[in-house]
């Protein structure tokens, strides 16, 4: 990860920690990674339920963040989920996933790798230099 992306990455992690809705991930390792980062939001895993059922459960929250993996399969899942959730009238956050993909796709394959990336870049860019 480049130094100029570090601040953006840090802001994404802060946003995840402060998020007050439900976060949809693909599997249990994704949830573990987010919990290690200090995320307290409700986390709904796709691995055990059909998409329509996940969307129905998530639709009970004011806002839903979709954090599927950063690969093609994750992209397809995110689009389908967003369509279902918008049909329920949910406010859907796909921008966080898009931002992560833009700055970290070369560094991680999926959400399960997020915590390890956070540790690596935190060590690399600590202490913060002026202008970073």
Curated annotation (Swiss-Prot):
What residue range is the signal peptide?
A: none
InterPro entries the record matches: TOPRIM_dom, TOPRIM_RNase_M5-like, UPF0292
- Report domain Toprim positions: 20-100
In terms of domain of life, where is this protein from? Archaea
Magnesium: is it a keyword of this entry?
yes
**Which Gene Ontology molecular function entries are recorded, alphabetically?**
metal ion binding
What CDD domains is this protein classified in?
Answer: TOPRIM_RNase_M5_like (cd01027)
Q: Which cofactor does it need?
A: Mg(2+)
Q: Which residues bind Mg(2+) 1?
A: 26, 69
Question: Has the keyword Metal-binding been applied to this entry?
Answer: yes
Q: Which UniProt keywords apply?
A: Magnesium, Metal-binding
How the cofactor binds, per note?
Binds two Mg(2+) per subunit.
Record: residues binding Mg(2+) 2: 69, 71
* PANTHER family assigned to the protein according to its UniProt record, in alphabetical order: UPF0292 PROTEIN MJ1624, UPF0292 PROTEIN TK1411
Protein family membership:
Belongs to the UPF0292 family.
* Protein name according to UniProt: UPF0292 protein PYRAB04740
């Amino acid at each position: 990860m480049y130094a100029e992306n570090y601040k953006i990455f840090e802001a994404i992690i802060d946003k995840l920690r402060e998020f007050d809705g439900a976060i949809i991930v693909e599997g249990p390792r994704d949830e573990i990674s987010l919990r290690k980062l200090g995320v307290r939001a409700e986390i709904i895993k796709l691995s055990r339920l059909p998409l329509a059922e996940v969307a129905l459960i998530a639709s009970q929250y004011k806002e839903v963040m979709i954090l599927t993996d950063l690969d093609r399969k994750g992209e397809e899942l995110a689009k389908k989920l967003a369509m279902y959730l918008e049909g329920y009238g949910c406010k859907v956050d796909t921008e966080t996933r898009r931002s992560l993909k833009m700055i970290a796709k070369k560094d991680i394959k999926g959400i399960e790798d997020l915590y390890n990336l956070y540790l690596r870049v935190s060590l690399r860019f600590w202490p913060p230099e002026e202008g970073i």
